[in-house]
Amino acid sequence: MTAKFLFSLFFILCCSVVYAQETSLFNGKDLTGWHIDVPALDKDTNLRNPFIIRNGMLVSLGEPQGHLITDKIYQNYRVEVQYRFAGAPGNCGLLLHASTPRSLYGMFPKSIESQMMHQNAGDFWCIVENIEVPEMEKRRGPKENWGITEGKERRVRNLTDNSEKPLGEWNTMIVECLNDQIKVWVNGDMVNHGFNCTAQKGQIALQAEGAEVEFRKVALTPITKISE
């Protein structure tokens, strides 16, 4: 009787606990679940798609420049991206809470960018959305220059140096978005934590911004709290 009771209790407890499941946003075969926005293709449809699949990896070729954007909108999540620069160091970014396309310089969707640029991973860039951090003037410059549109100071510097792996090695960027907060880790180092974000949901996007970047993991997990 006792064993039966304990088994029943165990079963009930197991059924009552819901574990957040990690979901891969990239199936390793094609770009299902994503769409591209590459302004140059409007004028010349013969240009190559800068986002391809190669050896089971998602690859941003860098040119022509543009974005690979999820079809779905996400809110309150952790996204893990494993990436490396395949050749020369360069620029790329992970865009969070993306919405209106081509809102900045006729290229960038309205969003908050978690920078992947070599030696600057984890900077925030405000793209017609805003976010705050402690010591704003130290990390963003004089307040009178702040802004979220062309010509304004949109960069919010990260908190660390040397968090990235040597060129050619794989980096892991983890970003947690919960309500108005965004927190970023690079290879286990907490590199940025913003609050009062003006957007709390949206699409996720990867950039083609001049350099070839390989991605072997892009995965999302729903969250209800920010990690310490």
Language model: regions and residue ranges:
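Bacterial Sec-dependent N-terminal signal peptides
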Residues: 1-21
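Carbohydrate-interacting regions of secretory-pathway proteins
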Residues: 21-228
